[in-house]
């Protein structure tokens, strides 16, 4: 491969892609004037041009031109440019190229973490078991770099959480997949994700929410516009499932199971976890009961819980012990009289019905406070008299 000095290469490049001559001339002028920020923007534009991509000239563009002044560029911008270059290689070459860039930008948090995320992604895409382990190690390193750091560029967070999402998907780790996928969605614009990918991600999120060991909050997902990708599709039933679980509505859950039994029978993630699903919705039913019960009346009988959860009375203590061990509620069980005294319920994102319920309870509390105030005022008047 021939090598050129920067300006010589630009002249050579104009012969390869004559349609881009004007852009290349502008780049030449900006380079000669050492306007590095403006040059960065021009490079970002030209490297996505179909003509340059078709000629597979990006690596030569980097080697013969960009590398001459790469230390003048903002490190994160350099990494983004190099990632565009790396996409023209196969997975292994792409990873090795970004590994060399990673060492050059190691002192810059944003740039370094972005390279780590890309390297982890290439390890994941290789499909080789050993490199899957390398993916994990690289993600752990990136996570360490993120600890205690705020205010990094959005692309740094979105790239990290996207690769983490894909990794946990590959490892069938539902709870971690759910957590990382929601973080990814919080840092990326939905319109940048294709409709097909949105539908796939929404489906996998719903399944992960339902079967994930430690997932007992569905409000984040229900409120996320990603679920619109399932509306009108064959997986639309999952939205109704989530909403039933979110409020612990066992009757609605049973109805949906019956209504959609044919398609549910094809969902092995659901059918293989039916016992866990029934336990989860029972716990969520308990949480809903506790949430709707005023805090000064949260001494709840086993029989009332059995009625709400549709469980036999003999299974209630086990349900309560499970909920306490998961730190979803705090309190104490009085086995003698079969009552639990709940002192705390895990916070969660509320739907409109739950918000209305809380509003009603606040209104009731306000009236009680007003009544108490009036009684105090009346007693004060009597004392003064």
Swiss-Prot record:
One GO CC annotation: cytosol
The entry's keywords: Proteasome
Pfam families in the record: PCI, PSD13_N
Superkingdom in the source lineage: Eukaryota
Segments forming a coiled coil: none
GO biological process: ubiquitin-dependent protein catabolic process
PROSITE patterns registered for this protein in UniProt: PCI
Entry's Gene Ontology molecular function annotations: structural molecule activity
UniProt cross-references to InterPro entries, sorted A to Z: PCI_dom (IPR000717), PSD13_N (IPR054179), PSMD13 (IPR035298), WH_DNA-bd_sf (IPR036390)
Domain PCI: 176-347
SMART domains: PINT
Main function: Acts as a regulatory subunit of the 26S proteasome which is involved in the ATP-dependent degradation of ubiquitinated proteins.
Family: Belongs to the proteasome subunit S11 family.
Protein name as catalogued: 26S proteasome non-ATPase regulatory subunit 13
Source organism (scientific name): Dictyostelium discoideum
């Amino acid at each position: 491969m021939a090598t050129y000095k920067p300006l010589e290469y630009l002249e050579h490049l104009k012969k390869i892609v004559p349609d881009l001559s004007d852009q290349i001339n502008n780049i030449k002028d900006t380079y000669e004037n050492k306007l590095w920020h403006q040059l960065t923007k021009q490079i970002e534009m030209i490297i996505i041009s179909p003509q340059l991509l078709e000629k597979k000239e990006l690596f030569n563009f980097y080697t013969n031109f960009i590398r001459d002044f790469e230390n003048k560029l903002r490190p994160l911008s350099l990494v983004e440019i190099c990632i565009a270059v790396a996409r023209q290689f196969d997975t292994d070459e792409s990873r090795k190229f970004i590994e060399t860039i990673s060492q050059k930008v190691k002192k810059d948090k944003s740039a370094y973490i972005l390279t780590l995320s890309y390297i982890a992604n290439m390890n994941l895409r290789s499909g080789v078991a050993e490199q899957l382990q390398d993916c994990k190690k690289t993600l752990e390193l990136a996570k360490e770099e993120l600890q205690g750091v705020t205010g990094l560029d959005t692309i740094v967070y979105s790239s990290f959480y996207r690769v983490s999402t894909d990794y946990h998907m590959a490892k069938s780790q539902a709870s971690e997949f759910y957590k990382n996928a929601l973080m990814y969605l919080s840092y990326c614009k939905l319109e940048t994700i294709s409709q097909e990918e949105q539908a796939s991600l929404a489906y996998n999120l719903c399944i992960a929410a339902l079967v994930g060991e430690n997932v007992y909050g569905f409000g984040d997902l229900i409120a996320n516009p990603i679920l619109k990708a399932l509306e009108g599709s064959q997986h639309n039933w999952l939205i109704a499932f989530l909403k039933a679980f979110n409020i612990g509505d066992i009757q609605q859950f049973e109805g949906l199971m019956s209504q959609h039994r044919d398609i549910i029978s094809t969902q092995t993630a659901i059918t293989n976890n039916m016992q866990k699903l029934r336990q989860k919705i029972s716990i969520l039913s308990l949480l809903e009961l506790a949430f709707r019960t005023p805090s000064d009346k949260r001494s709840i009988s086993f029989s009332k819980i059995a009625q709400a959860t549709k469980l036999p009375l003999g299974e209630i203590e086990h349900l309560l012990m499970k909920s306490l061990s998961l730190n979803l509620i705090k309190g104490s069980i009085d086995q003698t009289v079969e009552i639990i005294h709940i002192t705390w319920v895990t916070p969660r994102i509320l739907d409109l019905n739950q918000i209305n319920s809380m509003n009603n309870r606040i209104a009731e509390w306000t009236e009680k406070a007003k009544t108490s105030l009036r009684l105090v005022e009346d007693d004060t008047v009597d004392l003064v008299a």
